[in-house]
């Protein structure tokens, strides 16, 4: 069996725990939000080592602030994290200095508009009855406006490639929306089938195909968005296992879906819409978030590991979270980075 490299992220002294300060890394960085530990781990994608752990309590946020999702500027200059329980979206620079924040009730998923000065924010899955609105944040000022979407629990969220538009979908009903906030345009789309509970989208590199995962249905739903305000369901595929946060390969030929209750990642061919491979092992326990390197070689998948199935947990301690570094050429977990408890959203710059 191929040996898996395990890189211990410090819960002790080898990794700096910082509220701010220079990361001092020239290459790409990967960010992992630890929802039960009020921290964000910063990982050097080149060395696959933790270079900083941002302790949010040192910045005045509560121990139960629940950092959930991370979005990173395309050039890596700033990154954003949603705090479910503290009702905040935070903005950090590359050196992990907190440079802005805005209040938003129970924030969940984040998505950066690649053209405009906008960050979109949806509602957390933990929110039972949040406002039927998404947030539209001006990134430079961190000012926010809320936009009605007219359905309950808007969670899945993805900005369009051409800018000015965002797609969102409901946890509570089979409904999604295409929204152009600046134009005050909103188109609602009803999706057939039993309750899907849409967790998150992935958008193809050419911007023509939007893919959603249904927690309750276990289905992958493929929408044609060539008519951008009228997503059309073209195909569905049952994979089970609670499909979570997906990501496309840069060439568009593959989409990777963490399967949270199957401890696996489904590798789906986008030409045939069939499962090509299933990745298991390493620290893929309750896999949650995902990101991919700009060249498509490395896939980063977080593992909540709340069951403690991976690693050794001292008596009375909380199990560690994980970031799994997957070699997309071999389809194997090449390394596991230990991070604080309940590793959730993953963010990386996309060029």
Task: Identify the residue ranges that each predicted region occupies.
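Bacterial N-terminal signal peptides that target proteins for export
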Residues: 1-8
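Bacterial N-terminal signal peptides
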Residues: 8-16
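Predominantly soluble domains enriched in secretory-pathway, periplasmic, or organellar proteins
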Residues: 13, 21-351
């Amino acid at each position: 069996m191929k040996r898996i490299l395990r890189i211990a992220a410090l819960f002790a002294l080898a990794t700096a725990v910082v509220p701010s300060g220079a990361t001092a890394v020239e290459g790409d960085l990967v960010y992992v939000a630890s929802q039960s530990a009020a921290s964000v781990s910063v990982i050097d994608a080149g060395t696959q080592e933790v270079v900083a752990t941002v302790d949010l309590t040192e910045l005045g946020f509560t121990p139960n602030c629940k950092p959930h999702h991370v979005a990173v500027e395309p050039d890596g200059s700033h990154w954003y994290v949603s705090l479910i329980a503290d009702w905040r979206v935070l903005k950090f620079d590359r050196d992990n200095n907190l440079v802005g924040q805005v209040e938003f009730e129970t924030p969940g998923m984040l998505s950066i508009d690649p053209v405009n000065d906008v960050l979109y924010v949806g509602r957390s899955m933990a929110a039972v009855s949040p406002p039927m609105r998404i947030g539209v944040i001006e990134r430079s000022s961190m000012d926010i406006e809320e936009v009605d979407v007219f359905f309950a629990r808007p969670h899945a969220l993805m900005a369009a490639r051409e800018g000015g538009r965002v797609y969102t979908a409901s946890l509570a009903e089979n409904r999604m929306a295409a929204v152009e906030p600046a134009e005050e345009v909103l188109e609602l789309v009803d999706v057939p089938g039993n309750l899907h509970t849409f967790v998150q989208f992935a958008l193809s590199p050419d911007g023509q195909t939007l893919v959603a995962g249904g927690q309750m249905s276990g289905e992958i739903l493929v929408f044609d968005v060539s008519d951008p305000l009228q997503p059309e369901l073209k195909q569905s595929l049952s994979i089970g296992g609670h499909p979570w946060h997906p990501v496309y390969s840069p060439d568009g030929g593959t989409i990777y879906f963490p399967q949270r209750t199957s401890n696996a990642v489904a590798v789906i061919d986008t030409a045939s819409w069939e499962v090509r491979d299933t990745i298991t092992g390493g620290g893929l326990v309750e896999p949650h978030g995902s990101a991919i390197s700009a060249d498509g070689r490395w896939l980063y998948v977080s593992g909540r590991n709340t069951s403690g199935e991976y690693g050794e947990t001292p008596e009375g301690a909380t199990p560690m979270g994980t970031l799994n570094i997957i070699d997309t050429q071999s389809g194997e977990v090449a390394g596991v980075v230990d991070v604080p408890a309940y590793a959730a959203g993953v963010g990386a710059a996309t060029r």
